[in-house]
Amino acid sequence: MKFNFLLIFTLFITQFFCAQNKYEKETRIDKADFPENAYSLLETHLENARRIRFYKEIDSTKQSFEVKFKKRKLHYSVEFDPQGTLEDVEFEIDVVDIPEDNWMTIENYLKSNHNKYRVKKIQQQHPTLTDENPKETLRKAFQNLILPEINYEIIFSAKTEKGFQAYEALFNSVGKLITLRKSYPPNYDHILY
């Protein structure tokens, strides 16, 4: 009994600490390897899109499929789970696209928790709500609506004692931190010299 408790406790703690770091591997795949139901849901939104690419993504917490493309001068990323269920729609934005008060809240968090930082990328995220039709999520995302349920994903690097560390932070629509993970580059052990 004591052993089972220790085993479960150890597994829980390991999972908790691993979830704080992001080890991501993104592999480009053919359209044929992309979930068919996911593609059919997204197909009408891909009209007039350029640079359409399909990916399989494995990170420290999950596996997913992603399609990336450019449409109306915006870089989109639409993510699905392995069953083809829509998870979220993201597109790159600039600081000026975030309401000023909300950006000030985000910036205050960054300044108070990191001595020196540099924002590398900002994405507006439209997550699929549990009671919402995925088609509605896509409609809202492609109309670029600023809604209370959107999030901002900010990728930045910050100075630490050992140099610079990359982070991925997720903030809600008013600038409150939801998650913060250290982000590590892909492992290149497979490259032989």
Residue ranges and their predicted role:
Residues 46-79, 136-170:
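Exposed beta-strand-loop-beta-strand "reactive/processing" segments of non-cytosolic proteins
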Residues 21-65:
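Start-of-domain marker
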Residues 50-58, 116-132:
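Short glycine-rich, low-complexity/disordered patches
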Residues 46, 93, 99, 111, ...:
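Eukaryotic scaffold repeat domains enriched in small/polar residues
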Residues 82-126:
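Long, charged/polar, surface-exposed segments that mediate recognition or autoinhibition
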Residues 76-88, 163-185:
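A short, surface-exposed beta-strand/turn
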Residues 1-25, 42:
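Bacterial Sec-dependent N-terminal signal peptides
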Residues 23-24, 40, 66-68, 95-100, ...:
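Phosphate-end processing signature that detects enzymes handling 5′-triphosphorylated RNA
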